[in-house]
């Protein structure tokens, strides 16, 4: 079995309040080590909230996003194992947009013959 490490970036932009939307979902032979979840509120007047869950457990719960600002949601690496789902929910007025940026390491186990 070979192990392949890939350093990746994933970005998502939303302009509406949404609930339990999948962000990242590693396959069963993958493990994601998330280094950064950076969220940007592009509104000059609205302060929506965001929650992040990892397999139904809150990583961040109802984080208020300041106007025209970015915030780092995690301070330590976060492990997302294969077969689980990292999701987000937004609430409030999100019409100007909220960007979610994730930097992570994908550890992929490949079977070689």
Map each language-model feature to its residues:
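Noncatalytic modules at the cell exterior or secretory-pathway interfaces
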Residues: 77-96
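Exposed aromatic-hydrophobic patches
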Residues: 70-77
């Amino acid at each position: 079995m070979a192990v392949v490490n890939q350093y990746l970036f994933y970005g998502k932009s939303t302009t509406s309040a949404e609930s339990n939307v999948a962000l990242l979902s590693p396959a069963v032979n993958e493990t994601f080590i998330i280094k950064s979840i950076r969220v940007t509120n592009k509104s000059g007047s609205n302060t929506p909230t965001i929650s992040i869950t990892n397999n139904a457990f809150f990583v961040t719960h109802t984080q208020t996003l300041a106007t025209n600002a970015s915030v780092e949601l995690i301070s330590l690496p976060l492990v997302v194992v294969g077969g689980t789902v990292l999701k987000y929910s937004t609430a409030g007025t999100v019409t100007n947009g909220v960007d979610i940026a994730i930097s992570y390491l994908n550890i992929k186990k490949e079977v070689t013959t």
